Amino acid sequence: SIELGLKRFHIDVGDGKFINRVLNVENKVSYIKELNQSNNIHVHLMTMNPHHGKDKSYINRYSNLGADRIGIHRKSITNRNEISDALVMIKSYGKEAGIFLEVDEMVDENLLNTIKKHNINWVVLMGVPVGFGGQFFNEQVLFKAITLRKFALKEKRNLKIEVDGGLDRDNIIMCKKFGVDYLAGWSLVKSSNIGEYKKNINIIKKNLK
């Protein structure tokens, strides 16, 4: 990916509790940063209470490894009153804090108020249920993207919208039309053949121009 000129990476982290899989990717994050410090890493924390443990928290660990953006799920915070604590912690490390919106969550006043309160400029819309691969894309994501884009324009906010999961060569074009900035989907490009892998990336780049 890096050899092909890609500079932005979405990295999943799982603790086996919030999702059933354990995804420990500390070495991967370190490696990407070591290759080029300008590589931009989005860390997707699918972990329970990622702010707990202070110096041993997931937020602390991945901040120190060089993550540029760290996003959390509000459902992963046992005490909803601590959502603010987690976002503040991310920002205290000089990182961009983000919120992941799950398939069954809507763009509501609670979300918009949190965005304004903590000056959140990155929201990720899940296109599939969290923690599961190979799922069908939920088209409600497109309407959520429109709602967020209208909100951002009204508030004159430079909000970056990302879609994660369920993407294919057709719906990525729709996502772009509906105001999405970033697309995270390994299934779009993955291949055991390096030639095919490069071809897939080039096709996507061409389609999104």
Which ranges hold each PLM region?
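Glycine-rich, proline-tolerant flexible connector loops at the mouths of alpha/beta enzymes
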Residues: 8-27, 72-76, 128-134
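Alpha-helix-loop-beta-strand connector modules within alpha/beta enzyme cores
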Residues: 22-44, 88-102, 140-161, 202-209
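Conserved, mostly hydrophobic/aromatic
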Residues: 1, 12, 62, 123, ...
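Glycine-rich phosphate-binding active-site loops on the catalytic face of alpha/beta enzymes
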Residues: 70-78, 124-135, 178-201
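Histidine/lysine/aspartate-rich catalytic loop segments that bind and position anionic ligands
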Residues: 100-141, 147
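A short alpha/beta connector and helix-capping loop motif
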Residues: 17-50, 54-55, 172-188
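Hydrophobic faces of well-ordered beta-strands that scaffold small-molecule active sites
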Residues: 9-11, 39-45, 68-72, 97-101, ...
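Catalytic cores of alpha/beta
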Residues: 1, 49-64, 104-118, 166-183
